[in-house]
Amino acid sequence: MSGHSKWSTIKRKKGAMDAKRGALFAKLSRAITVAAREGGGDPEANPALALAVQKAKDANMPNDNIQRAIDRGTGAGSEAGDYEHITYEGYAPGGVAVMVEVLTDNRNRAASDIRYIFSKHGGKLGTSGSVAYLFERKGVVLVPADAVGEEELMEAALEAGAEDVELDGDHWRVTTEPSEFMAVRQGLEEAGIRYESAQLSMEPMNTVKLDASTARQTLRLIDALEENDDVQEVYANFDISEEVMAEVAG
């Protein structure tokens, strides 16, 4: 996502995510366990599990943790619980559209928490469908710009079925249709191209440019949502220039 991905990169460089690693692993484990419960423990035959496992690996979760999460989903007396997937939609300051993907065992608690976070940070929780039309589901693979040349990446990605390849800051951004995502990821791996992350994402079709003040408010809202235990993913359609991002992160 324009702006958001850059902010995430800045946070990683500053080490801000280190303190949240335990909470992140707990969320990733929950997603793996539920995916294994719903579709079986073989990633080759369960695309949802394959994506959850890949996301965990991208976050450097130990393989033992990943396997234990799969076992919880497939074993007798599963700890997966009665979790359900819910998507909330709303607005951040500046008219920024926000989508929040939740995996929760308590729908009422999740709704209350998400509504409170939006309200506290100057946003507003909307109704189903209020902003979803502003996004489209895409596969997104981020490749470090110094890991591969443009021509080599373009050839491998497009041959595997990618839709587009563009430079976004210090990363190449490979975009695919959801149906081609797994094939493109596999194609890059077979070509020996190292990528930093690969996931299905809700990509904004248009973006809202933010000044420094509104960017700070919006990013505080995004961070608060991401820190909630039930929240798996947050998507927003803001765009923050390099100059404003540097001011916000300074």
UniProtKB/Swiss-Prot annotation:
Q: Which family, according to the similarity comment? A: Belongs to the TACO1 family.
Instruction: Provide the protein name.
Output: Probable transcriptional regulatory protein Rxyl_1318
Recorded GO cellular component terms are: cytosol
Q: Does the keyword Ion transport apply?
A: no
Residues spanning the signal sequence: none
Q: Which NCBIfam families match?
A: PRK00110.1, PRK12378.1, YebC/PmpR family DNA-binding transcriptional regulator
Could you tell me which cysteines form disulfide bridges?
none
Please tell me whether the keyword Zinc-finger is annotated for this protein. Answer: no
Question: HAMAP family, alphabetically?
Answer: Transcrip_reg_TACO1 (MF_00693)
Which is one GO molecular function term here? DNA binding
- Set out the biological process GO terms recorded for this chain's protein: regulation of DNA-templated transcription
Places the protein is found = Cytoplasm
Sorted alphabetically, which keywords does the UniProt record give?
Answer: Cytoplasm, DNA-binding, Transcription, Transcription regulation
